């Protein structure tokens, strides 16, 4: 699984902005309408939320096409999953990796 430290960032009003300090347990999924991989990842997170209510928060779903900067950076990689501003995965999501990032904090 490819992981990359993206720095502390969150999406507010469709823009990428730094966070001070990091928000613990924040999940952002960058998606695109009509993307079957996006639907699979959002569905997986919803299922994991039901199974692990105390661990998995409600994700923030962001449309990559709503902002030119997002589209140019992430348009070819959706879905893109961040936990606390750290890129966890794109295209697919491994449940164990996701739960570990929420439980232990995201890592490289």
Residue ranges and their predicted role:
Residues 69-73:
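ABC ATPase NBD coupling module
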Residues 1-21, 108:
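N-terminal leader/targeting and pre-domain segments
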Residues 54-68:
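Thiol-based oxidoreductase modules, predominantly thioredoxin-like and allied folds used
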Residues 83-108:
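Non-catalytic, surface beta->alpha helical segment in thiol-disulfide oxidoreductase systems
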Residues 8-13, 63, 92-93:
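N-terminal, polar/charged subdomain of small-to-medium soluble alpha/beta proteins
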Residues 15-51:
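Local sequence-structure signature of Cys/Sec-based thiol-disulfide redox active-site neighborhoods
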């Amino acid at each position: 699984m490819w992981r990359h430290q993206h720095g502390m960032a969150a999406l507010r009003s469709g823009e990428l902005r730094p966070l001070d300090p990091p928000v613990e347990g924040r999940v952002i999924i960058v998606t695109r309408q009509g993307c079957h991989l996006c639907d699979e990842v959002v569905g997986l997170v919803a299922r994991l939320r039901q199974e692990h209510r105390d661990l998995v928060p409600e994700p923030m779903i962001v449309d990559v096409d709503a902002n030119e900067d997002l589209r140019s950076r992430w348009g070819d990689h959706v879905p893109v999953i961040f936990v606390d501003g750290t890129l966890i995965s794109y295209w697919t999501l491994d449940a164990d990796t996701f739960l570990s990032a929420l439980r232990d904090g995201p890592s490289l």
